[in-house]
Structure formats: C-alpha cells, structure tokens
Amino acid sequence: MKERLRPTTEPSRGGRGKRLRRLVSAILLLGVLAALVRPVRRATRALARRLDARVECFTEPGSSTYARVFAPVFGRLYRGVAEDVASELASRGRKRQPTILDLGCGPGDLVVEISHRLREARIVGIDVSPSMLLWAGRHTTTDGRIRFIVCDAAEVPFDDASVDLVVSTLSMHHWTEPADVFAEIARVLRPDGVALIYDLGLLSSTTSEIASIAEAAGLEPTDIVRERARGGLISRFFVRFTLEGLA
C-alpha cells in the first residue's frame, strides 16, 4: 500500500539550497532590466522556469521546500495584498459575507492573511497541485469559511456570477492559456465584482498584452500599478492588474 502523500519536514540539502538562492537572486537582478530590454525579459522567464523545475514546486518535496523557504519571503507582500483586498471590498460597499477566490493559492498564506482582515468572508483557495494543498489544508475551517480545492484555474467549480472578488499572486506566469483563465474569471465574477491579479512584471507578458487579453475575455482593466511600496523591496518587481466584471 502506498504511503499517503504528506508535507515533508526534512531540511533541504545545503548545496541545493545555495543553488536555489542563486537562481532567485539572478531572477531579481535581471528584473531591473527586464522592463526595458525584451531579450532580458525572455531570458528571465527561462530562468524562472528553470527554478520551478529545480524546486519541483508542484510535487513533493518541492512543495514543502516552497512552503517552508520561499513562501515566507513573500509574507510582507501577502499582507499588502490582503490589505488591498479588504480596502477594495470596503470601497465598493460589499456585503458582510463576500465570497473571495484565490487562484493559485499555493500553501494558503494569502488566504490566511485575508481571513484575518475579513472575519466573515467565505474564502476559497484553488491550486492545480495536490501537494501544495496538503500544506494549505492546515488552514481549513470546520465552518466552511476557508476551504481549498484542487483544480485548474481555467475550470473553476463555481456558478456563474457567484464571486465578489478574485485575487491571484505569483500564478499568472504559470497560466499556459491566460485567455481561458481570464474568461473563467469573467464568468464567475458578479456584475460588480473585481479581480486583483499580481505577478512579477519580468515574468509576465507586457501590460498592454495582458490588458488586451483581459478585455477580449470580458473584463475591464481599470488600474495597472507597477510598484507596491508597502510590500517591501520584493514588491517593486510586481505588477498589479485591477480588472472589473462588465455589468
């Protein structure tokens, strides 16, 4: 009988950890030039894919390495995103129990940060990786307020017009067909809903390309922010897209 898959607690090997840190440093360094030089942007994407393959983020032991080593690095960013989510809903006079969907939630850190600020919200995190959601499952609540689902971002098990806010961080550059994901976001959003999509600018397509894809899917890009100062140094490599559902 196969042993049930579970997050490993064994530390990463020293040499492997050093190589991973070098790859991350190289990606961030290239980010300074990526916005200006298109070949550098392509090289950075290739390096990021190499990092994903090296870490094996979507299977064990890579998921455990990500949850224990990489996810905490983005803690300050997640807190800033959670504040954005709360502010966005408050500015729209949202009901007390909004439904929030986190696409590509990984080990669930952002879901937890949002739940601390919106105590009555219903928050669902989805991810294509079962091993990532083994980590996220630690945060599941018995009342169903927080739960996680294994599924593709382009095939979300939600009814039409049932979600108040969609959020995604560090996931868009993994989408093989962004148009399909944006179409799914447009489908599940309520007519007055909003999506906040964050990704590393050096890994994603140009802002104009993404805006065009979103518009074709039935979403209206209302704001594009290249820097998020309150998220710390790392956040300066991010782009945030605010997309609204069409009434």
Task: Label every PLM stretch briefly.
Residues 1-51:
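Short amphipathic, positively biased membrane-proximal segments
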Residues 41-93, 109, 113:
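Conserved class I S-adenosyl-L-methionine
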Residues 101-103, 107-155:
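Class I SAM-dependent methyltransferase SAM/SAH-binding core
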Residues 154-165:
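A short acidic, Gly/Pro-enriched loop at the edge of an enzyme's catalytic core
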Residues 165-176:
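A short SAM/SAH-binding and catalytic strip from SAM-dependent methyltransferases
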Residues 179-191:
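A short glycine-rich, Lys/Arg-flanked "PGG" loop and its adjoining helix->strand segment in the class I
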Residues 193-199:
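Conserved beta-strand signature within the Rossmann-like core of class I S-adenosyl-L-methionine
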Residues 229-247:
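Core SAM-dependent methyltransferase catalytic element
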